């Protein structure tokens, strides 16, 4: 049986094109701070016509393979999590198989998992479970979380974003799953869904979605605490997690969610709540569950109490989600990548609790233990390979007008056929070695190219 199964290596790709939220506020005629303070977002990455979830996946996977010297023949399972529908039948995984076919490896299990922002977690758990099972053949698992989050013009548009993350799964990992510490909450709700197959845009009930997120958080945390207490014979509170990483549609929800965990600890009379905090929480002790979700006063008090804990346990996870935006399935893992980027020298022996949410709704809370392994599969090497700071600095800022123009073109192109992408002015923004969409033919078949290391445009997949 494989031991210490978890994440061996990670890499992230996000588009080099972005728009500043402050500029978007002014362009949209929104009140100053609506996006930057109200949502807690700084910047938003987006795909131009040259990029999509498939090209981003190619970039994340090939970069991970090159930097860790992984032979595609070493992969036995490939799982993709995404809610960005390119095709209602053909999976994103099958496009990626081109990287494996040329090496003669077609014996690769797994397909795509889809449920809003949760598919990446389903894909990850599938790979981890496979390595831990009797079915494991000794090869690595590979997980891709890839999404382009776009919204119609209006209040939801600033909560967009785009990215792909690749994770290599195997035994003796620096990031180990505490498999017994996992709790889920599944329910039927219409908080965010995409019933119009002719459009990329969702139908969203923002207020309901926030409540559903918090309900799922409460439920998962309660079950995780119960499981921990059965296994360890002692209580679990936020003090038992060194860091807590949240699915991040926008940063303000992350702040509210962490504060909610402290309120849960108060209701459970956990040791994380001191006397001063108890006094502040007491007026809200008799609220019904529904009342607690609607109480603005409780929300405010909770966040005040949570602030020092938040700064220590959550703030280091927020860089990429604030700078890139909502990456749907990749959001949780981009937040985790932010933690590795910020704290890679201090993570050995630490416990990280992860909370994944997908509308509809699906949610899982799970626990990771981080070890001080030797390179190439080490925490510090993951930070070095991802080069988050370098990638953020290399981006090109678009004016809001150009962003809106790009969104209109992408809206027009969604589900379209028989077109060749315009390279002029955009291809220069892509780094050498980057995969991009070349054309979609009259049969809707998608063809990708790869920018040469010398900047030339080469044929690809």
Curated annotation (Swiss-Prot):
> Which E.C. number(s) belong to this protein?
2.3.3.10
Disrupted gene: phenotype observed? Defect in pollen adhesion to the stigma resulting in male sterility under normal growth conditions.
One Pfam family for this entry, by name? HMG_CoA_synt_N
Gene Ontology molecular-function annotations: hydroxymethylglutaryl-CoA synthase activity
Active site location:
83 (proton donor/acceptor), 117 (acyl-thioester intermediate), 247 (proton donor/acceptor)
UniProt lists the family membership as follows: Belongs to the thiolase-like superfamily. HMG-CoA synthase family.
Task: List the protein's name.
Answer: Hydroxymethylglutaryl-CoA synthase
Organism expressing this protein natively: Arabidopsis thaliana (Mouse-ear cress)
The lineage is: Eukaryota, Viridiplantae, Streptophyta, Embryophyta, Tracheophyta
């Amino acid at each position: 049986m494989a031991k210490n199964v978890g994440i061996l290596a990670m890499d992230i790709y996000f588009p080099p094109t972005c728009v500043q939220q402050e500029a978007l506020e002014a362009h949209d005629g929104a009140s100053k701070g609506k996006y930057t303070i109200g949502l807690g977002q700084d910047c938003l990455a987006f795909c131009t016509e040259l990029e999509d979830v498939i090209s981003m996946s190619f970039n994340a996977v090939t970069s991970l393979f090159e930097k860790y010297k992984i032979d595609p023949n070493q992969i036995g399972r490939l799982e993709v999590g995404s809610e960005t529908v390119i095709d209602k039948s053909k999976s994103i995984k099958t496009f990626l198989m081109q990287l494996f076919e040329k090496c003669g490896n077609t014996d690769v299990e797994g397909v795509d998992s889809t449920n809003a922002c949760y598919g990446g977690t389903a894909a990850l758990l599938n790979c981890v479970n496979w390595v831990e099972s009797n079915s494991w053949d000794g090869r690595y698992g590979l997980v891709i979380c890839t999404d382009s989050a776009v919204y119609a013009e209006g209040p939801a548009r600033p909560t967009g974003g785009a990215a792909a993350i690749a994770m290599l799964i195997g035994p003796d990992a620096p990031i180990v799953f505490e498999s017994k510490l996992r709790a889920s909450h599944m329910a039927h709700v219409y908080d965010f869904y995409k019933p119009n197959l002719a459009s990329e845009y969702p139908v969203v009930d923002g207020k309901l979605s926030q409540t559903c997120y918090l309900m799922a958080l409460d439920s998962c945390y309660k079950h995780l605490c119960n499981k921990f207490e059965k296994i360890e014979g002692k209580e679990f509170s936020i003090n038992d997690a060194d860091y807590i990483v949240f699915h991040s549609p926008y940063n303000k929800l992350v702040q509210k969610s962490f504060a909610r965990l402290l309120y849960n600890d108060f209701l459970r009379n956990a040791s994380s709540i001191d006397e001063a905090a108890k006094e502040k929480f007491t007026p809200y002790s008799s609220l019904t569950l529904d009342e607690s979700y609607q109480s603005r006063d409780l929300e405010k008090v909770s966040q005040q109490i949570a602030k020092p804990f938040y700064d220590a346990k959550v703030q280091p996870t927020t860089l990429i989600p604030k700078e890139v935006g909502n990456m749907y399935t990749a959001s949780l893992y981009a937040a985790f990548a932010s933690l590795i980027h910020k704290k890679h020298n201090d993570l050995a022996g630490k416990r990280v609790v992860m909370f994944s949410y997908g509308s509809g709704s699906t949610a899982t809370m799970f626990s990771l233990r981080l070890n001080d392994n030797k390179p190439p599969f080490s925490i510090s090497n993951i930070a070095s390979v991802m080069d988050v700071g370098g990638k953020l600095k290399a981006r090109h800022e678009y004016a809001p007008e150009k962003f809106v123009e790009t969104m209109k073109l992408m809206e027009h192109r969604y589900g379209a056929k028989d077109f060749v992408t315009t390279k002029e002015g955009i291809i220069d923004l892509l780094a050498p070695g980057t995969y991009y969409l070349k054309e979609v033919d009259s049969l809707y078949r998608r063809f990708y190219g790869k920018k040469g290391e010398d900047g030339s445009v080469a044929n690809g997949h």
